[in-house]
């Protein structure tokens, strides 16, 4: 109680509080500048950002913090002879690992918020290139070979590309070929049965099992969607075509060489109205 009555303390505490407020505002302003450069920092706490920024001079020290700023990326692979070069991104879960090699080496030098932004761009360019490859492969390879050759994201995308292409072709040709809609409906069931049969096999890793189960889950929905369309086609006078709203409102996946995105010509387009 005697300390609380001390005049010096009573006069000093308000000053210290004002200084603390000033420091807090300065810190918020500093972190806002960093967030403006690398917007993913908006989803990270102030304390975590300060730790990340303090590691900027050594890219290897960033390893524990990638999962705070990226989804499904919790490590990167550095060049063994030059730690400033990032060669690949990884998703590691227990003993399982999913690795994607970057199309172009990313240099982890300079301010950490700057090179993290460059890493995002290289990741996007790499995934776009893999998307283009998946779009070309999915119609040419067997289902099993295609799924085995691609990580989960692109195995799923390839199945969605195929489903969209097959269903759209059936609806476009429905007036000339009376059987094509039902044939395509049966084809989607065959795909689902093949995917489901893999779940009974030894898939080696939990990550691979999760990948196959995801493909099954999504294709169950896709198969149900087209089954409903096939039923509507049978019941409606004149049937359906590819311009019908019942088809256009579905999520459809295309690789468009004539489209473009932030990284140049051609693009993956997800359509739906």
Predicted regions and their residues:
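Amphipathic alpha-helical packing elements
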Residues: 20-76
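Short, charged/polar, low-complexity loop and linker segments
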Residues: 1-7, 26, 95-104
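Extended, well-ordered alpha-helical scaffold/bundle regions in very large, multi-domain proteins
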Residues: 1-12, 16-19
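Short interface patches used for recognition in eukaryotic signaling and trafficking proteins
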Residues: 4-8, 34-35, 47-50, 209-213
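Extended, charged/polar low-complexity intrinsically disordered regions
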Residues: 63, 67-273
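Extended non-catalytic scaffold regions that mediate assembly and binding
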Residues: 3-5, 40, 89-90
